[in-house]
Amino acid sequence: MVGPENSEKPTILIRGWLWFRDIPSKPLAKLRGVARQAIELAKDDPRRLIHSLKVGLTVTLVSLLYYLQPLYNNLGASAMWAVMTVVVVFEFSVGGTIGKCLNRGLATLAAAALALGANHLAILSGGENEPYVIGLFVFIQAVAMSFVRFFPKVKARYDYGMLIFILTFSLVSISGLRINEVIKLAQARFVTIVIGASTCLAVCILIYPVWAGEDLHKYVGKNISQLGNFLEEHMDQCFKRSSDARIEITKPSISNLNSILVDSKGREETLANLAGWEPGHGQFMFRHPWKQYLKIGNLTRQCACRLEPINDYLNSNIQAPQEIQCKIQEAFSESGKTLKELAWAIETMTKPSSANPHIENLKTASENLKILLRSGIKGDESDILQIIPIAVVMTDMVSSVEQIGDAVNELSLMAKFKSKTGNGVEGESEIGHDKNCIEIGMAEIPSLSVAIDERTEFSADEQILI
């Protein structure tokens, strides 16, 4: 007869064996997961893999300064600074690499020159006072440069240079206390940094260059296009006519706009900062108006913010009169067409002349909605009162779209976009409204009135519409 204690032993042994058997499979599963993630990253943007290969090539090239004896005899152990320079300054984009190279080179040159001056003053002060004078200079420059880093403009463009200045000044000035040939030390450090930075620039620019300005240009156009697609296509699906001629409202999702509202600001500012370091390339001339892209991006985010209260309205159970629904749908459609035309103008770097008709139609749709609300509409008084704030938001959204159009026009003038040729795509898509909605003209709208209590209070914008 087997007791309880004896019956537990085989169970423990089986569990132990299963645990021991699964030990090799766990690392393999993790490795497979990492491999899948690496493949996805490479497929998502093949430039990442190319950048990694470029970094490996550059590090190998500058390592020859240390491997080859003739080069090592001239530079000595300072040749290792070339490898360190490549590791810290080689960035994904050309603008990032140029910015770091210039920051490192100029900061090293300025700090080394000042450190030599500090050493000379320390020598003049006497042998016993020399360490104290050097320590005072190191303290003053470290405090000053660290504080200067907090300036917003310095933080954005020259923060890396400030760090290199502190490092170089401290190394050269302190080394002067123990090394007699401090000038040779500073010279070797500067030469190796120039060699490393030059190799980085050559590989970064000549082999599959990644331009931050081009990425910014495409990113801003993509955001405007996403917003236009949402307004024209997705919102159009929110208005579907049922068999009893009532307009049903589906619940749209604004998850596609999260990238515009949340992530775009930081990315645009980073790309614009890096693009400022880049020379003229391709269709982008020297001193291209990159800051104008930031203005367009801000206006795009403001327009996207207008959709949140409209989304709440579409998710509600309010059944507005058919006339108002048609006018809101018309404003959505024209806003989407306008934004898509503006995005196309940015992507192709052509003047946005084809967007002008849509902007005029958008203004007309907005005015029609205002006139329709002023004329009075039959329906539930509470529903109509809740629609008035939505109409105000619609007016603000129309204004945002017009501002985006003005900003894109300014960009086309500043960047000298080419005019559209006769072979260009000039076609205008038909307005996809319901036939009954299009037939509703302002001349056909009867003079209706809504019994609104005179004691009802409205906001300033709502009073303008009423």
Which residues does each PLM region occupy?
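Aromatic- and histidine-enriched alpha-helix N-cap/loop-to-helix transition segments
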Residues: G56, N298, Q302, P389-V392, ...
